[in-house]
Every structure is written in structure tokens, then in C-alpha cells.
């Protein structure tokens, strides 16, 4: 198997959707296509140039669209049309890749029916970053055959107390669903692969010391929930790629 496609989803929160051009660029550097699922009625003008990498989702708009965005990425990969040896992986919109090795090494050892979870199982949760499978497996695990199935799943799992505040009530619904759906899947492959992640405090320390080419030491960078606040760091990472 080989990783060819990465998917993330977002609503009309500008601090998140401004990541789309850089997600597209960063993954393209590694020969991987990025697809953004945009929850809303239309694509914002400032990212319209990325339209070829954006799929508009205008369903479930009567509930909190942050919830829709968090959960949509679990379901939509089932609808992608890809060759049997290709994988689609999901990610967070504010998480950018620093190399391809972490995501691609060893994938040739897996088969079409495998669901690959890169990290470790945390209680009754499976982290969104990172999971990869062929669309047929996403379809089988989540019982998705069309957009109507996705719309229904999102409504059925919606918690009315969800407020979109990170860490608050129902924030981890997506990770809990992922666990429930996957834990008994016979071809779940848990890699327990350690990850070298750079957070923004550490990134700023590198910059203040005048370090160069340091992103090669990391697998991903978490530009914590804001493109605008971290744009100078993102542009620095782009130069280092």
C-alpha cells in the first residue's frame, strides 16, 4: 500500500481554513494530494485558488459546524475513488507535515483490508492524527455508502451540549467514535509509532537561537489552532522544506 491522499475538514473559521493553501503545498512537496472538506455554503474568496483541492459540504449546517468539521473527515474518505493499493489518511487542519518518512515508511507491508493507526490507543479514544486506509475500508468500518449516510451519522452522534470549546463537553466525540468503530475491526493495525512533534513554544525557541533546517528533526508541527497567529512560523517551515 502507499499513501497518496490526505484529508482534513474545516468550517468557516478563518484561523483554520487559511491553512488550506499551506496544507496543499506541504503535502505536495512529498508527492501527496491534500483534500480539504469545507463545511459551509460557499468557499471563501481568499482560498478560492485552492478550489481543486476543496470539497464543499453544505449539509448539517443547522448544528454546530465545528462539530460537523471535526467528524466529517472520518466519514468522507469512504466516498473517494482510488486504486486498490492507495491509502487516504486524515489529519488536523492545524497540523502540518515536516517529512514524509513518518507517514509512508513500511506501508508496503500492508494490504487493502488493513486500517492503519499510527499512534497508540488512549483509553477509549483513537487520535485523529493519524489514521490511514483504503476508501473501501473507511466505508466498511463506518458503514458509509453515500453523502446521505454521512449526514445521518453526524446528526445521530451530535451532542446538543457541544460548544466547540477545545477540551470541553463532547469535544472528543470524534476520537471516541473512532475507537468504537475500530476496536473490533479484525484488520486494525496499531503501529504505536512514536512521533516527534514540534509545538509553537519550541519552534519559537529554535527561531530565537537562530537555528536552521531544524524541521528535519520533526515529523509534524502543531500550529496551534491559528494560521494568523503563527503565519511567520509557517512561512519559516515552508522555506525549510
Where are these regions (language model features)?
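Catalytic core and acceptor-binding pocket of nucleotide-sugar-dependent glycosyltransferases
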Residues: 139-241
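A conserved donor-nucleotide-binding helix/loop in the catalytic core
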Residues: 61-88
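Short glycine- and hydrophobic/aromatic-rich loop-to-beta-strand nucleating segment
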Residues: 125-138
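The conserved acidic donor/metal-binding loop of glycosyltransferases
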Residues: 90-96
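Conserved donor-nucleotide/metal-binding helix-loop-beta segment in metal-dependent transferases, i.e.
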Residues: 96-127
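A structural signal for well-ordered alpha-helical segments within the folded catalytic domains
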Residues: 18-21, 25, 75, 172-180
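Short acidic, S/G/P-rich loop/turn micro-motifs used as interaction or catalytic elements
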Residues: 12-16, 96-97, 138
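N-terminal anchoring/stem segment of glycosyltransferases
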Residues: 1-62, 84
